[in-house]
Each structure stands twice: as structure tokens, then as C-alpha cells.
């Protein structure tokens, strides 16, 4: 092993909120974190808006956060890229969209637009859907159908009605489109191989099977009566004259307007894989012209990608690998992609000297039922790795403050913070025993605001709050405030390396 171990611990969803009410972090009994904040140099780091390549005022998220941390520069996110493309007009000339329209003309088939209907900006943005409706209008397409996935996580849990109304107004204004199905993201956007959920979403869109309603608004109202809010709205088929408005059929075109890959993959596979094993498709495989807004998975066949990835050279992981350092990435399932794929700038490749450990997330319906998640198992494993003395750098993510924060259950979020505090109480001393340095930070906020300050209802989304950075084991250094892009240069500074020219972030250690 080289001179010292440098460990970055990302407390996912752990923000700083000056307000005490609804603040699960403030309410939690966390003696270790409190002591670290008292005894070691710390500062605040910005995680939202233009600081991470998002539009002003847009909350950060785990994908964006880890990409910025690993890149050591502000990375302009897909959301910003696509919005800019609509504003500049090149969106309407995209070859992939034009080919989808041409496919509809050639086969006299339908165009289906589906994705998350919200302005949360984490997985999608409704303005991109409006851009596609405008595109369809310009292409003179008549049979255009929208399949709405409701959010309730990155926006308030009961806000679907407003998004539906806005969409219906846009459809009237633009003069094209009709809502064919609605459903919660719980079904259409699973990422944990819970294929029984995905099947219900697929069957609604392909077979016209599921709950029925005469309009999207009626579907929402009926669902709320059953106490099933946006995320959990059961796949519902909109009916007209006794039959579904539209179903997806052979040679139809589909544009999936979600830009974040992780929750878009499963439903995409159901539509595009010839030999699909997730569940039995009653109609089997049939060809469709499928456009992914961004690259969901480079191994996917039978899809085209509208906004192809822009490569990031010399991310932190790649750079220290070239320098001959050994690194470990460790997290539980929910955040494993974030400390690997996203941290490496959207690259699947594992670098030389990079090891990865995945600890399974617990199989529970919602994480408020098990707020500790798999933190203890992650901790046991990372302690084992620290004690082996094989690594120069360890990147660890604790998922709890974010995943439990998303449930909106205050007591559970508090318990989640207490669980990770207990874990930090073991991990930090283990690193210090080896004269190592620990950086504790977060990728964005969540658990520090569990209530909506305007309505008093539960708040399940991320926040725009800054996050802490605590530097332990480096003596009494002076730190300045910064943004997530400054973390990789800070770690390189501690490791004694010049940062590569591609990294525009700056070390937060004041010399």
C-alpha cells in the first residue's frame, strides 16, 4: 500500500437545513457525526443547480452528484442538454426522432411517447414531452399517444392531477396527442428486477389490460380514493367508446423521454428484447421502432439513442488507476451504480486496480420498514477491506438518508441516520488507525427536510440544500466552501498528485 489510505464516505441524501422542523438529521441521536463536526475541519458543499450542471434552482440527485464528484468538474446533465436542444431548435431535426416519424408513415402506425410526467428533473422533464408533441405536430403525425408514468417522489406525492391538467392543456394547444395509459413509477420504472410490477405496466400499454378509466383525471381521482398516490397508481387504461384509446402494436414507434437510465432499462427490455426472460409476453416479441432519449445501456439491441453520451476523460477513478493506485468502490444495490458507473463518468469499464463490492439491499416493499437497510453489512465488509491494507482509496456510499427519506416517514428517516452514525463510529477509527484520511460528505440533501413547509404534508423529494464536508485525519487544515466538482481535486491534493487538466474543480484545502 502507498503512503496513506484516503476514504470518501458519501452519506446519500444528507443535507444541511437550518430549520429544525421536519429535519430528521437534526432530530436523530448521532453522537459520532456530531463529534466529527465539533472536532474536525468542515465546510459546506453545493449540490444543486448550475453548481452541478443543472438548471438554476434544480435540486441535485444521486446520479448527477456522483458524476460531478468523480469527474472533478461540472458536468452538464442530460436535462440541461435536452432543454437547450429544444431551445436551440436542433431537437426537432434529430435523426432518431425523424426516423421514428418516418417509421409511422411507412407502416401507417402509431407514435407512443412515454416517460415520467413531472418537472422533478431527476428522470425526465415534462417540457421534453411537450417538445416531442411539438415535433409530432411539425411532422404532421395524427396517431400520437402519451403513456404517463406518475412521479410522487421527486415531486409531491399527490401532484399528478396538476401535471395531467397541464399536459391536457398542452395537447389542446399544440393540437396533437391523446393520453392512452397512466400508472405509477413503482410499476413502470422498477430497477430491482421486480418483473411482476413491470408486467402490469407492459400489459396496460400493449394489451390494454388493467384498471380502466374514461380519462386520465378520473384515473387519478379513483386511485386517490383507494389511497394509492402518484408513485403507486395501478396501471390504468384510458377507454374511449368501450375500448382502449390506444395500445402499442407491431411497427409502432416509441419515444421514451426519460433521460436517466437506471429506472428506464427494465421496461425498455420488455419492449425490445427478442429473447426476454423477465416475464411471459402474451404477444411474444414484435418489432417496434424504439427511441431511448439517452443511452440506457450500451448492450441494448433494437433501440436507437437520441442524445448519445459525451465522454469524460480523466475522471478520478481513471486518473488514480493510471497512477498505479488500488481503489475500492462499495455500496448496497440501491447506490451501487452510483459509486461505480456514475462515479466513473458513465463508463461501465472497471479500471485496473479497481475493485467493486455490491451488498444486496433488503427486499422490502418500502425502506421505512427497514431503515437500517444493509448499512451494517456494508460496514462489516468495508472494515474487513480496510484491515487488509490493500487499498489506497475507498469510495463508500451509505444509501439510508436518501432511500428512507424518499418514503416521507420521519421516524424511519431518523432511525436511518442513527444507523449510519453507528456505522461511522466503527469505520472512521479503523481508517485513522492506519494514519488514513476520511472525507465525509453527501451527494445531495433529502432527510433534513421531511415535511413540505408550505403544505405541512410529507416531503419525499431531494432538496437544494448544501451538504457537509468533514475532513478527518489531516490535522487542523483550513477548508473553503465549494461544490461537488471540488471533491476529486481535494482527494488528489491529499494523495499528493497534481490534478489532470480536464478537472476544473479546485481543492477545498486552503494552502
Curated annotation (Swiss-Prot):
One of its GO terms (cellular component) is cytosol. Its EC number is 5.4.2.12. The active site is at residue 62. GO terms for molecular function: manganese ion binding; phosphoglycerate mutase activity. InterPro entries: Alkaline_phosphatase_core_sf (IPR017850), BPG-indep_PGM_N (IPR011258), Metalloenzyme (IPR006124), PGAM_B_sf (IPR036646), Pgm_bpd_ind (IPR005995). Keywords: Glycolysis, Isomerase, Manganese, Metal-binding. Substrate binds at residues 123, 153-154, 185, 191, 260-263, 335. Pathway: Carbohydrate degradation; glycolysis; pyruvate from D-glyceraldehyde 3-phosphate: step 3/5. It catalyses: (2R)-2-phosphoglycerate = (2R)-3-phosphoglycerate. Mn(2+) 2 binds at residues 12, 62, 443-444. SUPFAM superfamilies: 2,3-Bisphosphoglycerate-independent phosphoglycerate mutase, substrate-binding domain, Alkaline phosphatase-like. Binds 2 manganese ions per subunit. HAMAP family: GpmI. Catalyzes the interconversion of 2-phosphoglycerate and 3-phosphoglycerate. This is 2,3-bisphosphoglycerate-independent phosphoglycerate mutase.
Amino acid at each position: 500500500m502507498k503512503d496513506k489510505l484516503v476514504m470518501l464516505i458519501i452519506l446519500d441524501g444528507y443535507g444541511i437545513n437550518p430549520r429544525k422542523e421536519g429535519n430528521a438529521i437534526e432530530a436523530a441521536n448521532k453522537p459520532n457525526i456530531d463529534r466529527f463536526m465539533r472536532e474536525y475541519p468542515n465546510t459546506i458543499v453545493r449540490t444543486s443547480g448550475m453548481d452541478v450542471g443543472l438548471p438554476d434552482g434544480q435540486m441535485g440527485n444521486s446520479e448527477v452528484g456522483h458524476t460531478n464528484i468523480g469527474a472533478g468538474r461540472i458536468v452538464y446533465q442530460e436535462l440541461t442538454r435536452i432543454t437547450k436542444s429544444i431551445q436551440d431548435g436542433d431537437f426537432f431535426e434529430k435523426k432518431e426522432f425523424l426516423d421514428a416519424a418516418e417509421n409511422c408513415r411507412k407502416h401507417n402506425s402509431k407514435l407512443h411517447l412515454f416517460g415520467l410526467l413531472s418537472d422533478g428533473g431527476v428522470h425526465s422533464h415534462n417540457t421534453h414531452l411537450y417538445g416531442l408533441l411539438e415535433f409530432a405536430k411539425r411532422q404532421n403525425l395524427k396517431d400520437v399517444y402519451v403513456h404517463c408514468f406518475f412521479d410522487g417522489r421527486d415531486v409531491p406525492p399527490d401532484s399528478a392531477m396538476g401535471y395531467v391538467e397541464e399536459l391536457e392543456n398542452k395537447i389542446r394547444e399544440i393540437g396533437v396527442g391523446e393520453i392512452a395509459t397512466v400508472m405509477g413509477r413503482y410499476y413502470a420504472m422498477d430497477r430491482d428486477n421486480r418483473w411482476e410490477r413491470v408486467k402490469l405496466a407492459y400489459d396496460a400499454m400493449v394489451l390494454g389490460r388493467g384498471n380502466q378509466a374514461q380519462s386520465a383525471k378520473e384515473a387519478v381521482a379513483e386511485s386517490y380514493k383507494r389511497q394509492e398516490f402518484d408513485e403507486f397508481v395501478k396501471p390504468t387504461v384510458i377507454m374511449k367508446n368501450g375500448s382502449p384509446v390506444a395500445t402499442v402494436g407491431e411497427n409502432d414507434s416509441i419515444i421514451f423521454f426519460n433521460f436517466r437510465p437506471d429506472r428506464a432499462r427494465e421496461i425498455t427490455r420488455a419492449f425490445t428484447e427478442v429473447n426476454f426472460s423477465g416475464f411471459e409476453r402474451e404477444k411474444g416479441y414484435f418489432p417496434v421502432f424504439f427511441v431511448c432519449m439517452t443511452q440506457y445501456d450500451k448492450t441494448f439491441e433494437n433501440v436507437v439513442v437520441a442524445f448519445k453520451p459525451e465522454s469524460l476523460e480523466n475522471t478520478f477513478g481513471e486518473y488514480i488507476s493510471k497512477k498505479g493506485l488500488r481503489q475500492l468502490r462499495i455500496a448496497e444495490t440501491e447506490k451501487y451504480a452510483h459509486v461505480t458507473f456514475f462515479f466513473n463518468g458513465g463508463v461501465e469499464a472497471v479500471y485496473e486496480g479497481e475493485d467493486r463490492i455490491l451488498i444486496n439491499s433488503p427486499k422490502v416493499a418500502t425502506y421505512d420498514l427497514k431503515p437500517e437497510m444493509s448499512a451494517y453489512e456494508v460496514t462489516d465488509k468495508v472494515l474487513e477491506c480496510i484491515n487488509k491494507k490493500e487499498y489506497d482509496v475507498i469510495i463508500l456510499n451509505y444509501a439510508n438518508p436518501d432511500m428512507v427519506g424518499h418514503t416521507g416517514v420521519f421516524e424511519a428517516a431518523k432511525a436511518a441516520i442513527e444507523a449510519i452514525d453507528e456505522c461511522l463510529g466503527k469505520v472512521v477509527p479503523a481508517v485513522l488507525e492506519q494514519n488514513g484520511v476520511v472525507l465525509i460528505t453527501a451527494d445531495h440533501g433529502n432527510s433534513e427536510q421531511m415535511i413540505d413547509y408550505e403544505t405541512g404534508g410529507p416531503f419525499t423529494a431531494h432538496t437544494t440544500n448544501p451538504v457537509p464536508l468533514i475532513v478527518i485525519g489531516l490535522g487542523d487544515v483550513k477548508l473553503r466552501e465549494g461544490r461537488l466538482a471540488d471533491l476529486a481535486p481535494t482527494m488528489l491534493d491529499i494523495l499528493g498528485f497534481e490534478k489532470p487538466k480536464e478537472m476544473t474543480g479546485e481543492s477545498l484545502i486552503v494552502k
